[in-house]
C-alpha cells in the first residue's frame, strides 16, 4: 500500500469541508502569492462555491498582487465571479470604534457627564489610545472573523463557503491564533466580575438597559464557536510558506510546533523561489548552480523532516507574479507539481508584467 503524500495541494484545493485556511510564514517568502494562488485554484476547481480571501497583514499586498484596489469590504476579483478579497484596515476599524464611542457618550449625555466624555473622545482619542496596544491588529482581525461568522449564521450579506487568510509574518499570526484561548479565559474572568458587579457597572457606564452579562455570554459563545472550528481538521488547516534557506526552515519548524500546541491542523508546506537545475547554458549560470546546490541541501532536510506533509516545490519565476493572469499560470503548480523539464517555459512567460 502506497502511503506517499502527494507533493501538491490537490486534496485541499478540491476539499468541500474546509471553511478556514490560513497561509503564513516568515516575512518575504511569498505568503501573499501563495494565498492568492490557493484562492484562485479553489475558485476555479469549485465554480459553484464562493471564496473569500482576507489579508490580516498590516502591509496589505492583495491589492498589489491582483493589480486592483481592495478595502475593508469584500469585493469580487475582476474576472472571477466566485472569488472576493478584502483587506482589514486596523486604523479604519479603530476610527469606527472611536466614532461609535463618541455617539454613545453623546447619547448618554443627559446628566452632563456624557458631554465631557464625548468631547474627550472627539478627534480620535480612543483610536490613538488603543492603537498603541500590542496585538491590537490581531484583535481587530479576529473581530472581523467573528463578525463574518455572525453574518453567516444570520444569513446577512453574501455568504462564503471558504475563507482563506493571507496572514501577517509569523509572530503576528501566532498572536492572532492565540486569541480564541486568551479571550475565552479573559471572558471567564469578566463573567465572574459582572455577575457580582453587573448592576453597578451598568449604572457607572451609563449603559441604561444594556445587559452587560448577556453581552459577555454572547461574545463568549461566539469565541468558543471559533475556537472549536479552528481546532477541527475538517474545517480548518494551516499552510506554511517558506524558502529553502536555514532561517526560513528554522522559523517554519517553530511555527509548526506552535500550531500543534494550539491543536491546529497543519500538513502542508509551500517552498517558494526554487531555481531548479536547468540543462541549457543560457539559464544556468554558475551563481544559479551554487544557489540551487544550497537550496537542494535544505530541500532534502525538509523532505526528511516533513515526510508526512504535502511539500509543494514552487519555482522562482523570471518576472513578478502580479495580476490575475500571471497568478493563475503560477498557481497551477499547487494543483499539479512543477516539472522543470516540461513546465520550465512557464516561468519565462511570466517575465513580462501585465
Curated annotation (Swiss-Prot):
**Which InterPro entries does this chain map to?**
Anion-transp_ATPase-like_dom, ATPase_ArsA/GET3, ATPase_ArsA/GET3_euk, P-loop_NTPase
**Which processes are annotated in GO (biological process)?**
cellular response to oxidative stress; pheromone-dependent signal transduction involved in conjugation with cellular fusion; post-translational protein targeting to endoplasmic reticulum membrane; protein insertion into ER membrane; response to arsenic-containing substance; response to heat; response to metal ion; retrograde vesicle-mediated transport, Golgi to endoplasmic reticulum
> Example GO molecular function term?
protein folding chaperone
Going by the UniProt record, its keywords in alphabetical order are: Arsenical resistance, ATP-binding, Cytoplasm, Endoplasmic reticulum, ER-Golgi transport, Golgi apparatus, Hydrolase, Metal-binding, Nucleotide-binding, Transport, Zinc
Q: Which residues bind ATP?
A: 26-33, 245, 272, 315-322
Q: What is its EC number?
A: 3.6.-.-
Binding of Zn(2+) occurs at 285, 288
Question: One GO cellular component from the entry?
Answer: cytosol
The record's active-site residues are: 57
Q: What is the effect of changing residue 30 to R?
A: Abolishes ATPase activity, leading to secretion of resident ER proteins
Give the UniProt subcellular location, in the record's own words: Cytoplasm; Endoplasmic reticulum; Golgi apparatus
Question: Mostly located where?
Answer: cytoplasm
Task of the protein: ATPase required for the post-translational delivery of tail-anchored (TA) proteins to the endoplasmic reticulum. Recognizes and selectively binds the transmembrane domain of TA proteins in the cytosol. This complex then targets to the endoplasmic reticulum by membrane-bound receptors GET1 and GET2, where the tail-anchored protein is released for insertion. This process is regulated by ATP binding and hydrolysis. ATP binding drives the homodimer towards the closed dimer state, facilitating recognition of newly synthesized TA membrane proteins. ATP hydrolysis is required for insertion.
Annotated family: Belongs to the arsA ATPase family.
Entries under HAMAP family matching the protein: Asna1_Get3
> What other remark does the UniProt record contain for this protein?
Present with 17300 molecules/cell in log phase SD medium.
Instruction: Tell me the subunit arrangement.
Output: Homodimer. Component of the Golgi to ER traffic (GET) complex, which is composed of GET1, GET2 and GET3. Within the complex, GET1 and GET2 form a heterotetramer which is stabilized by phosphatidylinositol binding and which binds to the GET3 homodimer. Interacts with the chloride channel protein GEF1.
Q: Supply the NCBIfam families for this chain.
A: GET3_arsA_TRC40
Q: Which named protein is this?
A: ATPase GET3
